[in-house]
Amino acid sequence: REQVNMSQRMRYVYPKSAKSGIAQALWRSWGIVRDLKKDGVSLYHGLSGELPIGIRKSGIKSVVTIHDLIFMRHPEYYNPIDVMMYRAKFHLTCREADRIIAISRRTAEDIVELGGVNPKRIDIIYQSCGVRFANVVSEEAADETRRRYNLPERFVLNVGTIEERK
């Protein structure tokens, strides 16, 4: 929440009755469209590569951000049932979305190739980080940090996961 600069026209909406993980997943896939229409939402942005079923028929415009298609390029890293679900959601999303945001040129190419999407529906918007991470520290502070953590003069910091697919 702290990453979003809220305006008076924005608000967070959560499922009222979906307390369990399964119920929340069902709400995100089916129930949310009813709530969006009831609340007069005119634009929905799916941030995690999927859109709710029926969003196009609802008349609500939609945008989806797709980060990658690893589950299609390397299904061996996933449970086969997950791959089936992700594929189904991906193809539905490709049909339903008014616009698609790809986070890289490679992802955009994959969406065209694997999803049959017209490239004119895709915008490439590279990810970045907030300005609070752009602070340049003094040489003394950097030296102190290297000493504290016993780091060499030059090193690569990876804040990713140790999963093989990443």
Q: Which residues are covered by each model-predicted region?
A:
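Carbohydrate transferase catalytic cores enriched for Leloir-type hexosyltransferases
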Residues: 1-166
